[in-house]
Structure formats: structure tokens, C-alpha cells
Amino acid sequence: MWQAKKSLIEDACKAAENYYPDEFLCFFGGNKEKEIITEIVMLPSYNSEESASISEAVLPIDDTIIGCFHSHPNGNNKPSQEDKKFFKKYFINAIASSPFNAENTAFYSQKGEKITIKLV
């Protein structure tokens, strides 16, 4: 089962709150074999009320990026079809909805299936 520090997820949610009403996008660093998220990775992205996107050219070339986190300011933390396409690139994916906190953050697999993670 994937795990992460609750404070790390809360930090990502705080950043999402700061971008509101625009969507916010960041990435998770960690260890895919141990299924642990260890850091938030901030990279230059384009943010708007409708979407958040990033140029693949700015992503690290190694395997330290294991997941993504983004916000849905509309209060819905379910993935869109575009989200599901994006999820295929990462082992773990998160969507936070307003109000932004760990409790309103849903986690998804590469297949777009909702999963439970352990917050420690």
C-alpha cells in the first residue's frame, strides 16, 4: 500500500489553495518499489481555471518522479478523461478538491482506479 506523510499532502494542498481559482499541478518524488512518496517536486507549469499542464521537456530524465498531484477547484476530486490519460505516466496520482486538505484528496492508480494510501 502506498504511503506518504500527511504533512506532505497538506503542503501540496496549501499550494493548491494559493493557486485557487486556477488548477495547480506538482509532482511526487519517492520510491516506487517501497511505494512511498517522499517529496513534492515543483516544476514550471501552466495553470488556469480549466486546466494545468506542463511541458515534458522540464521533467527529470531519471525515475525519481513517481506521481502527480493536481487540484480541481470545482470541488470534484474525480478524474476527467484527460486526467486518466495523464495518470498512465505515473505510479500514483492525486486530485485535491476545494476545500483543499488531505481529506479532500483522492488517490488513483495508473489505470485511473481509486486507491487508498496510508497517511502517516
Identify the residue ranges that each predicted region occupies.
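Conserved beta-strand-loop surface patch within small alpha/beta domains used
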Residues: 1-65, 74-120
